[in-house]
Amino acid sequence: MSSSRRNFILDAGLTASGIAVMSNALSSCVSASDKVVVALIGCKGMGFNDLTAFLQQPGVICAALCDVDSNVLHERAAEVEKMTGKRPDLYEDFRKVIDRKDIDAVIIGTPDHWHCLPMIYACQSG
């Protein structure tokens, strides 16, 4: 799938603004432990780039990764471990990630046609 320059710039701008907003939000509302625990659902491409940006913020911990491709899942887990020193828990079923009570935020990095269902489950779980 090719992308026009306009779409690329729009996507890059939206990603940057989302990271900026999350950076401010994370710094103003940290949990009682002063840590924000995140999980990533969909570990390729933009989702992992978003997670990498989040992990550069102080007080952010990646607790879980989820992807249907176990090769991608293990590759990304190794990268997170290299960045943070801690290996996240791994899942192939996003519902198990959302069911965890220790997760503060979920990054949904699935392909476009798969964003909706994990987002609805995450919103329902609070």
Show which residues each predicted segment covers.
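N-terminal glycine-/serine-/threonine-rich beta1-alpha1-beta2 phosphate-ribose binding loop
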Residues: M1-S125
